[in-house]
């Protein structure tokens, strides 16, 4: 029985005002997906996992993309799909997107499809439909490409890798005792259907500032760019500790801070001027004030999805 295994890293999407556009892959966690072909004479998908994720193929973000690829390309096979979760689910770390990305990469390798990175994103987006009901491209784009990415088009998929000319590290406040059923789906329902022009203009200024800050290596532009007047504010009930953690991050000279994806994790970018220990100490105290136990994870920018070489 032939098998292929791929690894995809966690991600923090949105990055302030880049809702459904920007995302950053990081080394905090990773998912691994192994796909084995049992036979090509029948069609079936059996899922195994170390975590409590749906085991129905159309409801699992790793396997729904495979269903769609096989339909689209007329591939007939019975698969055994092992989803080894390293990324905690439902915490704003791109867990569903990473599973989808690793699965599509492993499948592409197994069937010699040589899918382009854009095609990997296109198919992995089906995984986000399984997990949140919406094909948001940002998490999967970061898990596919690595680094910081901007999804400039979804039909067709076009992803731009953002050159990073500022060296930073990553702190993530991960609230491990928080569980929100179908979190991203619920968070997306909280996004307003209409926005004030002034908020739109400010958010456009922020996203411009963030991208220019990354490219030109300007710390103050990155800090300014990690703000959002619309989506984070609408979702604040999901992470009420966020404003104070952001205040603490700036107090101890972080580069900047924003919500990680749809939350409830919080992302802090740091550099040599930052007192990371004080941020971690006072930030976890803030979580506790809201009856939340935050674990502080240190990470760096991660690379893109990879097929694991089997020894
Ligand atoms: N392979 C998978 N990995 C993680 N979550 C999955 C997977 N398949 C389905 N899900 C479901 O998707 C939801 C987690 O995805 P989501 O809400 O987007 O949060 P996040 O991407 O921040 O982990 C959970 O309800 C989980 O049961
Ligand atoms: N743009 C999406 C990103 C969701 O990221 P996740 O890691 O929380 O799944 C959104 O904000 O809905």
UniProtKB/Swiss-Prot annotation:
It catalyses: L-homoserine + ATP = O-phospho-L-homoserine + ADP + H(+). Keywords: Amino-acid biosynthesis, ATP-binding, Cytoplasm, Kinase, Nucleotide-binding, Threonine biosynthesis, Transferase. GO terms for biological process: threonine biosynthetic process. GO terms for cellular component: cytoplasm. The keyword Metal-binding does not apply. Pathway: Amino-acid biosynthesis; L-threonine biosynthesis; L-threonine from L-aspartate: step 4/5. It comes from the Archaea. Catalyzes the ATP-dependent phosphorylation of L-homoserine to L-homoserine phosphate. This is Homoserine kinase. It comes from Saccharolobus islandicus (strain L.S.2.15 / Lassen #1).
């Amino acid at each position: 029985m032939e098998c292929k295994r791929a690894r995809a890293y966690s991600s923090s999407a949105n990055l302030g005002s880049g809702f459904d556009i920007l995302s950053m892959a990081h080394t905090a966690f990773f998912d691994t997906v192994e796909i084995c072909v049992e036979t090509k004479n029948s069609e079936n998908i059996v899922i195994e996992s170390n975590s409590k994720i749906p085991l129905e193929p159309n409801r699992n973000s790793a396997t729904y993309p495979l269903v769609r690829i096989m339909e689209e390309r007329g591939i007939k096979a019975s698969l055994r799909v092992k989803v080894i979760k390293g990324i905690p689910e439902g915490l704003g770390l791109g867990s569903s997107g990473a599973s989808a990305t690793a699965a599509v990469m492993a499948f592409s390798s197994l069937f010699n499809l040589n899918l382009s990175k854009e095609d990997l994103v296109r198919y992995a987006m089906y995984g986000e439909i399984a997990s949140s009901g919406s094909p948001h491209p940002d998490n999967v784009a970061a898990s596919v490409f690595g680094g910081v990415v901007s999804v400039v088009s979804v039909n067709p998929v076009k992803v731009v890798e953002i050159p990073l000319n500022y060296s930073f590290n990553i702190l993530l406040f991960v609230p491990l005792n928080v569980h929100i059923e179908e979190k991203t789906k619920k968070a997306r329902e909280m996004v307003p259907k209409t926005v004030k022009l002034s908020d739109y203009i400010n958010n456009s200024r922020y996203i411009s500032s963030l991208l220019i800050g990354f490219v030109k290596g300007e710390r103050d532009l990155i800090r300014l760019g990690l703000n959002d007047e619309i989506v984070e504010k609408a979702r604040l009930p999901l992470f009420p500790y966020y404003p104070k953690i952001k205040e603490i991050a700036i107090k101890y000279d972080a580069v900047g801070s924003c919500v990680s994806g749809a939350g409830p994790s919080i992302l802090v970018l740091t550099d040599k001027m930052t007192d990371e220990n004080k941020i971690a100490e006072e930030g976890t105290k803030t979580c506790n004030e809201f009856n939340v136990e935050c674990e502080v994870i240190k990470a760096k920018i991660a690379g893109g999805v990879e097929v694991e070489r089997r020894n």
